[in-house]
Structure formats: C-alpha cells, structure tokens
C-alpha cells in the first residue's frame, strides 16, 4: 500500500501520485478474511484522509475518503456528489431505468422516497414484532437439537428474507431463487455473472408487475400500480427500478449483518456471556455491532470540480462512500477498532445506515430483526462457537458479509468444555 510510482497510466493526470494506493479495496478486504475490519481500521493510520485507488472490483478507479467528517459532507451535498448511475445493473443490460429512489437526486428523490416511507414506519415495524419472533423461534427449533448448524443457510438467509417477502407480499416459495440471485448479483467479482443475474431479476420483476396489473392484490407491487408521481401513474421503468431496489436491499443486508454479528459473538465468548447476563444490553450491542461491522459501500459521481482538504476532485470522478471507514474513524470513536457494548452510541452516531437524504428507509425493520435474533439465540441456545474443523469465509464485494459460518454448541449431557473447544478451533 505504498504510494504508487509516477506512471501516466492507468492513473488520471489530476490525481497526485502521493495520494494513489495501488490496490483494490474490496479484493484486499476479502483477502483479509476475518481480519478485514481490523485491516480497514489501520487505513486511518496508513493513508491520507482522501486517497485514490485504480480499481474496485470490476469498477473503475475512485476516490476513497476515510474520515467520517468528509463522508458526511459528501452525503449532505447531492448537488455536487450525485447518486445518478450509482449501480451498473441497467447499463449492463443495455437499459436506462434507475434504482429509485437510490439513484435519484433531490428534489426529484423526495417524490419516490415518499412512496416507500409508509411501509417502514416504527408503527408498521412494531406490528410485525410477534411475527418476527415466531419465525425466529421456528428456525431455532429446527437446529437447536443438532448441536451445530450452517448459520447462513439455517438462519441468516431465511429469517430476514421470509419477513421481507411477507411484508412485500411476494411468493415465499421463491425464496431460494431470490437468495441465489441477490447473493450472486451483489457479491460476485465476475461481470458476466452479475449481468446474468440482473437479467434474471428484471425478468421476474417484469413478469410479476404484469401479473399484478392483470390481477391486483394486497401487496407492494399492487400498491405501486395505484401510486402516482406528479399526478401521473408510475412508468414501467419506474416500477422496475423501485422493485429492483427493494429486491436487492431487502434480501441481503440483514443477512450480512447477522453473519458478521454472530461470528463476532462466536469468537468472543466473554461478550456473549455479557449479553446473556444482561439482556437489556442487547439493544446497545446491536448499535455497536452495526458500527463495528458496517457492510455497505456506495458511490457518488462528482458533478463539478470541488476541493476537499488538499484534494481536488474533477467533474466525472467517482467517490466511494465507505461506511466501514466512517465508523472506524478514531477522530469520532475512541478505540474505534474495539467492540464495546457499553459505548455511548448516541454520543457519536454511526453511519451504518448511511446519512442524509439517502439514509436507509428500512433501518427500523433491520434493527428490530437484529435485536430479536440476538435475544432469542442467546435465550434459547447454550454458548455457541465456531464449529470444529470449519473456517468462516468473508466477502467484501459490494455488501460485506460472511460467505460461510458454521456454529456449534454443546448439547445437554455433553461434558466437553465449550471454552476448550473454542481455544482448539481458534
């Protein structure tokens, strides 16, 4: 990660060589595996406040601000840092629809956001509490007597996905297909794989829209068919863009958080014990784990030349919004690389759900799901650990998360010490 040599290609002429770090951030984080977030924290000591990398997966070079202050400034200035063209999906298909409202700037953005806000209010989420608990308990029932499980497949994927599909009124029986599409769409480094899955998703959504147009129901797509923007019905492209956004946002983010949170608890039995002894602390633990293991990266396009610190960004430059770097900023959080469930989250709010006009509309639902999952696992299962002869696998492409996470716990009558097993597998 040393400054790159003065080479005219592939680095833009306006990027000073001392600000260039010649690596792919997502690939490097993935290679770091379980040490990814510790490595990310070191970037606050080893890189300039804003640096430039020549590649990001299959995406071109981008500026990477690492300070929370700079990232907040960027997110609060959509006129200079635009969300238009944030994702590559429609472009890969040779189409022109937008993920609304994610890829739309103010003031137009507010019109689309207003369509989604009523679906995710605290009151609406509160009404789901018992359904969320029921589903979590059912999934725990399926594994509790086994003594181990593939946590991703047994819980982290089906739990939030089934809740979300129920909320949207989408077919529950298609869950495995939806999960495959979103996982390969968001986490693949292969451009053809991303293109193929984007095409599959758009085909399903268009078919679903046509079916609901002919046979309206009490579901999200039917709701959009009766909604209006500026006194007119939504266009087919607008319907597609909103459904596509809801599809990928609702089917992966909580899954990714659950994998990272439970990996942490499995690796840190003392903090697992802390929450078992004081369940009232779980809400604070969720906030601290959201901060410590943020999962979302976004991009912005510079619309005009702008100066931030010593850096001059030119019109057309890309800027990476890295929530993990913002939330590991030592200027904001003391001992930022340390997970502390008693940290005062309210004193220094994290940016796990982004910031500004594009802040995550589903944050209330996500928090509720994460809290209930942790409460019930800690209440119903004995101390769990990383399963013997398994190694958790981490992926940092797009939305960060665990590719594989096998957990194990002692069944009644098993005299083996969980602590000694944890030590042996660490």
Q: PLM ranges: what are they?
A:
Residues 1-426:
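Cytochrome P450
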């Amino acid at each position: 990660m040393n400054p790159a040599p003065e080479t005219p290609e592939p680095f833009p002429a306006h990027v000073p060589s001392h600000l260039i770090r010649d690596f792919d951030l997502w690939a490097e984080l993935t290679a770091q595996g379980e040490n990814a977030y510790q490595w990310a924290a070191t970037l606050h000591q080893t890189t300039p406040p804003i640096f430039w990398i020549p590649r990001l997966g299959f995406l071109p070079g981008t500026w990477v601000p690492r300070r929370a202050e700079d990232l907040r400034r960027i997110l609060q200035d959509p006129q200079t840092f635009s969300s238009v063209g944030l994702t590559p999906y429609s472009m890969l298909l040779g189409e022109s629809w937008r993920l609304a409202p994610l890829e739309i700037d103010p003031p137009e953005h507010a019109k689309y956001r207003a369509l989604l806000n009523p679906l995710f209010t605290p009151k609406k989420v509160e009404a789901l509490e018992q359904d969320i608990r029921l589903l979590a308990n059912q999934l725990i029932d399926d594994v509790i007597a086994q003594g181990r499980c593939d946590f991703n497949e047994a819980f982290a994927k089906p739990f939030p996905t089934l809740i979300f599909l129920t909320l949207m009124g989408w077919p529950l029986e298609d869950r495995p297909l939806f999960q495959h599409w979103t996982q390969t769409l968001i986490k693949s480094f292969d451009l053809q794989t991303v293109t193929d899955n984007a095409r599959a998703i758009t085909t399903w959504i268009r078919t679903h829209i046509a079916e609901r147009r002919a046979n309206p129901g009490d579901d999200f797509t039917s709701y959009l068919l009766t909604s209006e923007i500026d006194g007119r019905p939504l266009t087919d492209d607008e319907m597609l863009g909103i459904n596509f956004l809801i599809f990928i946002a609702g089917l992966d983010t909580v899954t990714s958080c659950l994998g990272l949170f439970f990996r942490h608890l499995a690796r840190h039995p003392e903090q697992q014990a802390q929450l078992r002894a004081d369940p009232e602390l779980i809400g604070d633990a969720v906030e601290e784990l959201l901060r410590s293991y943020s999962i979302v990266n976004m991009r912005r396009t510079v619309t005009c030349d702008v100066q931030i610190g010593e850096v001059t960004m030119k019109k057309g430059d890309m800027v990476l919004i890295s929530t993990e770097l913002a939330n590991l900023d030592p200027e904001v959080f003391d001992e930022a690389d340390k997970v502390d469930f008693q940290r005062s989250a309210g004193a220094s709010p994290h940016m796990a759900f982004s910031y500004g006009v594009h802040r995550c509309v589903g944050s209330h639902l996500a928090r509720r799901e994460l809290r209930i999952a942790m409460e019930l696992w800690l209440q119903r299962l004995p101390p769990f650990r990383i399963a013997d002869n398994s190694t958790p696998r981490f992926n940092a492409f797009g939305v960060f998360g665990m590719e594989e996470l096998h957990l194990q716990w002692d069944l009644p009558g098993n005299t083996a010490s969980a602590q000694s097993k944890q030590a042996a597998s660490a």
